[in-house]
């Protein structure tokens, strides 16, 4: 059995009482590359559906007038997200954007946000491939994808423990206090762990182990 994250491997263990090997899905890291020059805004790009919890990002930044949030995406929960944001000037809605526009936003954002509990979370890899750190909810695939200061000397983001505006506000404040601890180089290097080439190599290794040769 193959699982796309350790989070899913643990669920397989609990529900089916079977062990699963983890093979992360491939991400087109060549399509998401860093550029020089960050701008002073945070980005969340998501479908507007309840489990994505974009409303929490809006509610948090409504209380952080000195921080700018750009929200990309559309969907059935858009009205609820707009209501959570209020009419504050530091939150901008971009709606649906092209892939090129999304890449440009990811490249220039100060950090990207991910509040959903995902099985994996490809967008988190795409953001880091652009050299952009992640602030993410610390359950699900984010634990495989985001490298925190507690784990390594070249971190790529922070994880927060609760899906609440308060937890996100705290994460933003911690991120700002850490200054230059999160580099584009570290983010890009981390994203390469999930490249198509890394996936092919991992799959070859799985096949070789189970066929008994390599």
Positions of the model-derived regions?
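Short alpha-helical donor nucleotide-sugar binding micro-motif in glycosyltransferases
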Residues: 96, 104-109, 203
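Short hydrophobic beta-strand element within catalytic cores of glycosyltransferases
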Residues: 133-140, 146
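Donor nucleotide-sugar binding/catalytic pocket of nucleotide-sugar-dependent glycosyltransferases
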Residues: 1-33
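Acidic donor-binding loop of glycosyltransferase active sites
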Residues: 107-119, 132
